[in-house]
Amino acid sequence: DLYSDFNIGDELRTNADALKERKDWLGTEKERLNKMIAEDCDGIVTGLYEYWACYQPSFPQKTTFIPFPIHTYPQYSNISDDIPKKIKLFIGISKSRSEYKGTDIMLKAAQAIAQKYPDQVELRMAEGVPFAEYVEMMNGSDAILDQLYSYTPSMNPLEAMARGIICIGGGEPENYEIIHEDHLRPIINVLPYYESVYQALEHLVLHPELIPLLKRQSIEYISKHHDYIKVAKRYEAFYLLCPSSGPSGTT
């Protein structure tokens, strides 16, 4: 089934955050402004597959996909072949958006796994901390849990992957197809259900030999698709193709 922050298959999500977002955006000034900007602009850049899937059908001629820009970190590129005796899981918690983003489900699954395998799993949690502190707490982790209802990793998981931290979250086939990636599969994809997250975590705990390869692929994936210099050049190229760009244009 297709899923998002708002639905799972044909069923609309009824949690408070999803209801608030629908009320905020459907049939409102926000929706009208969004549509007006989309119709008036020369180009639409989407950074997640979900964004592309929303805009491309209505604006096929001016919608493009460009991955989010991420700094690369050479100091993290030397991944050891050593298999960790204890897997360090990391999860960031924003109380106001926990249910909306699926963090509540991911946390329960991670806690259950940590309880079942106390000698093999360490669970780290960052709750309501500034981003710099969040990154400091995240560093040294083996895997991050984030974005249960997404097809693609967003900024925090991408930052983690640049540091050789495995993303457990959105890694659907569409994510790889849109960037034409046929080889690398660094993301441990999960469906938006407790059982899926639990099974994925347990599989990783029981097969820690997978970790070095996934870490290396995570770094390679970011370098190949998200390096901020490469992304900036793609933005420039797209801008130059837009009808209003250039010295004689109005942009």
Regions found by a protein language model. Name each.
Residues 66, 70-101, 107:
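Conserved donor-binding/catalytic core segment of Leloir-type glycosyltransferases
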